[in-house]
């Protein structure tokens, strides 16, 4: 049996690869989609909040690039210095991909009961707390 670290890395790589493929038709990547979702959670979000909330998902340079891409593509705007907000196009883009992401989530959890999923997440969360 392979150790948990092996499967964590393989799962993350598979999730990223499949999400990037799924989102490419919408001009997004997994990281870009995550950035839009973080900004969507508040009326205005600081860049530093995006970097902090997604620190486990990507390095600061990658996140900063994703923010820059979303700004350049018109999905985000800067209502104030160092503040981000979704544009109407950004909201439309998130809504357009929501159904596809839901199908992706079903695919990625096929054959896994809700209880098994919760157990897996709980175990990984506890392991993370043990190590931080």
Regions found by a protein language model. Give the residues of each.
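Residue-level detector of well-ordered alpha-helical segments, enriched
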Residues: 3, 7, 31, 35, ...
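Long, low-complexity, charged/polar intrinsically disordered regions in eukaryotic proteins
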Residues: 1-22
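Short alpha-helical
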Residues: 14, 30, 92
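C-terminal regulatory/oligomerization modules of transcriptional regulators
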Residues: 45-46, 118-132
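Charged, amphipathic alpha-helical coiled-coil/dimerization segments
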Residues: 68-122
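N-terminal helix-turn-helix DNA-binding core of bacterial DNA-binding proteins
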Residues: 17-69
């Amino acid at each position: 049996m392979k150790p948990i670290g092996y499967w964590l890395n393989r799962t993350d790589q598979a999730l990223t690869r499949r999400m990037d493929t799924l989102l490419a038709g919408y001009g997004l990547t997994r990281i870009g989609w995550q950035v839009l979702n973080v900004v969507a959670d508040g009326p205005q979000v600081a860049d530093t909040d995006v970097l902090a909330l997604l620190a486990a998902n990507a390095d600061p340079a990658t996140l900063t690039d994703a923010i820059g891409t979303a700004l350049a593509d018109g999905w985000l705007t800067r209502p104030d210095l160092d503040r981000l907000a979704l544009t109407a196009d950004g909201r439309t883009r998130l809504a357009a991909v929501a159904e596809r992401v839901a199908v992706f989530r079903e695919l990625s959890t096929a054959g896994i009961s809700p209880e098994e999923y919760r157990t897996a997440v709980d175990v990984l969360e506890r392991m993370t707390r043990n190590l931080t």
